[in-house]
C-alpha cells in the first residue's frame, strides 16, 4: 500500500516483495523493525543490513567510486501508514537502525537511497511532504555521485521500468 504512493509508485507482486525481503530475513546481521498500534496491527516497518548483503545494484556505485561497501550499513525501507506520520516514529526508526549499524564490526557509515523524481511529476500530490528535512536534521547528506538503477513496475504501467536512486550518507 505505502509503496504505491508517490514517490515510489510501486505496483509489484507479493512474490517480488518476498524475494526482495528475503535478503533481510536470511541475513543474520540484518534488522527488521515492525511498528504496531495498540491493537497489534502493523502500522509501519523499517529495515537495514550491511551493504555487502544488499542487492548488487545497491553496492555497485560504491565499488565504482572506490568505496568499501563493508564500511556501510544500508537502510532499506522505512514506511508508516499515513495516520502515523509526523509523530516521531520515523526518527525512532533511524535511532534503532543507527544503533544497529554502530554494533556491526567495521561499519562506519549509514546509507540509504531515494528515488529521483522531478518536483513537477504529474503524480506528485499537492499534499506530498518530502522526507528530506528529516534526513537533513539527522545529518544525512545527499551524494549525487552515488546513484543506483533499480527496476520496478509502476502503477498503471505494463512492465518494469528502470529508476534512478540517489544515496544519502551519514558518518556514524
Predicted features along the sequence, with ranges:
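C-terminal "cap" of GNAT-fold acetyltransferases
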Residues: 127-133, 138-141, 148-172
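Polar/charged side chains located within well-ordered beta-strands of beta-rich proteins
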Residues: 46, 94-97, 135, 170
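Conserved GNAT acetyl-CoA-binding A-motif
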Residues: 75, 94, 101-127
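Short beta-strand micro-motifs in enzyme catalytic cores
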Residues: 31-33, 71, 162-168
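A short, well-structured alpha-helix characteristic of acyl/acetyltransferase catalytic modules
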Residues: 1-5
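Active-site rim helix/loop that mediates acceptor-substrate recognition in acyltransferases
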Residues: 7-38, 42, 47
Amino acid at each position: 500500500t505505502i509503496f504505491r504512493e508517490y514517490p515510489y509508485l510501486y505496483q509489484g507482486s507479493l512474490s517480488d516483495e518476498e524475494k526482495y525481503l528475503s535478503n533481510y530475513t536470511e541475513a543474520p546481521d540484518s534488522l527488521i523493525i515492525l511498528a504496531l498500534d495498540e491493537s497489534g496491527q502493523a502500522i509501519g516497518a523499517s529495515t537495514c543490513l550491511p551493504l555487502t548483503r544488499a542487492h548488487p545494484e545497491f553496492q555497485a556505485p560504491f565499488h565504482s567510486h572506490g568505496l568499501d561497501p563493508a564500511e556501510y550499513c544500508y537502510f532499506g525501507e522505512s514506511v508508516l501508514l499515513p495516520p502515523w506520520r509526523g509523530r516521531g516514529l520515523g526518527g525512532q526508526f533511524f535511532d534503532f537502525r543507527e544503533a544497529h549499524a554502530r554494533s556491526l564490526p567495521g561499519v562506519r557509515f549509514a546509507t540509504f537511497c531515494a528515488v529521483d523524481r522531478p518536483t513537477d511529476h504529474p503524480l506528485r500530490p499537492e499534499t506530498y511532504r518530502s522526507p528530506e528535512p528529516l534526513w537533513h536534521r539527522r545529518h544525512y547528506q545527499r551524494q549525487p555521485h552515488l546513484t543506483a538503477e533499480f527496476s520496478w513496475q509502476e502503477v498503471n504501467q505494463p512492465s518494469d521500468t528502470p529508476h534512478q536512486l540517489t544515496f544519502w550518507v551519514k558518518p556514524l
